């Protein structure tokens, strides 16, 4: 369940966030699937709106990264102000570092 550090979000707000996130993530995937440049992918309006949702979207980003890997690293860095991966890590290592961090912080199981 999404939460802000120390403050749980209501079930209704959680569902609203999840619905908005799913809609935006689907739009982003659809509109950017043909793009090869990550910088163009992360500059898409739907992606920027997701990052603008703030810390409450972190569990949803991590779930999405676990289930459907994509370029969510910039959104995670923007919403957490943190990067758990080493500088020279491969995309799969970055993914694993984020998922481990998410588990250690209680964002995901």
Listing of model-derived features with the role each one plays in the protein:
Residues 1-109:
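Extended repeat-based scaffolds of very large eukaryotic assembly and lipid-transport proteins
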